[in-house]
């Protein structure tokens, strides 16, 4: 019996350690697969409507815009996320009864940030928008598919010389930049689907952990995740929940 127990224990240890010991694709190969997966969606623009929730200092921005405070001090407000590829992402709050000109907004255009004072000065909202743009609004380079992704990750401080495997949201993921337990800049991609699922980086003095959850959901499909979360200090600070995603809507250039 003791021998059987030892064998079972050894098998369990091997199963847990398997991701660390598995074959690792070269980073350029991973990024090429990521680029191909996103390019297969055929997206030039994307509109995602839903609800944004925030706690702490970020909740004040929602309350000032007409949001409601729920249990635990969390504020909530309808919102819209629009993307124009390459490199333009806009988060817009949608208070009831507010005209288009009155709606608070935040725009990330390449590395530039602009928008309403309250949102543009909040590093957590900026980090959420910047990570979304980094992971969902990359251009396609047919000649070198990995290059736009490598450049975007390098801008966020992710080392392109180290990689590992880790587990995220119940699935195995490629971890670019180091080990899964590191708190330095890392980019995570689902091992099987090659969808982006997590980005750790620094926005100003804020250590941001942005998570893209629930790919393939009825609300977002393969175009957008079910939710985008911003964690700081191990706690959830902002969450955008997708209610509807629309591929390639006609969006005015003026909003970007």
Protein language model annotation of sequence segments:
Residues 57-82, 91, 117-142, 151, ...:
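Subset-of-secretome marker
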Residues 3-4, 139, 251-252:
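Short, solvent-exposed coil/turn linker segments
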Residues 23-32, 41-42, 108-184, 202-203, ...:
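Flexible, processing/modification-adjacent segments and terminal tails
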Residues 1-11:
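Bacterial N-terminal signal peptides that target proteins for export
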Residues 21-120, 159-161:
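N-terminal mature ectodomain segment of secretory-pathway/periplasmic proteins
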Residues 97-99, 165-256:
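Gly/Pro-enriched, hydrophobic low-complexity segments
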């Amino acid at each position: 019996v003791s021998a059987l127990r030892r064998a079972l224990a050894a098998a369990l240890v091997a199963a847990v350690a398997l991701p660390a010991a598995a074959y690792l694709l070269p980073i350029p190969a991973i990024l090429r697969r990521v680029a191909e997966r996103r390019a297969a969606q055929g997206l030039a623009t994307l509109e995602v409507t839903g609800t944004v929730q925030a706690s702490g200092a970020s909740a004040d921005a929602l309350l000032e815009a007409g949001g409601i405070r729920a249990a635990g001090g969390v504020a909530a407000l309808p919102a819209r996320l629009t993307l124009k590829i390459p490199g333009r992402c806009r988060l817009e709050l949608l208070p009831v009864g507010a005209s288009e000109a009155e709606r608070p907004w935040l725009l990330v255009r390449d590395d530039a940030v602009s928008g309403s004072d309250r949102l543009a000065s909040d590093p957590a909202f900026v980090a959420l928008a910047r990570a979304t743009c980094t992971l969902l609004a990359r251009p396609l380079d047919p000649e070198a598919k990995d290059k736009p992704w490598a450049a975007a990750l390098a801008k966020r401080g992710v080392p392109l010389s180290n990689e590992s495997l880790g587990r995220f949201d119940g699935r195995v993921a490629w971890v670019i930049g180091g080990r899964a337990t590191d708190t330095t800049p890392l980019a995570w991609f689902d091992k099987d689907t090659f969808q982006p699922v997590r980005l750790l980086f620094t926005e100003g003095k804020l250590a941001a952990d942005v998570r893209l959850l629930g790919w393939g959901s009825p609300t977002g499909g393969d175009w957008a995740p079910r939710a985008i979360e911003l964690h700081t200090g191990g706690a959830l600070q902002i969450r955008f929940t997708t209610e509807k995603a629309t591929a390639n809507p006609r969006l005015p250039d003026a909003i970007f």
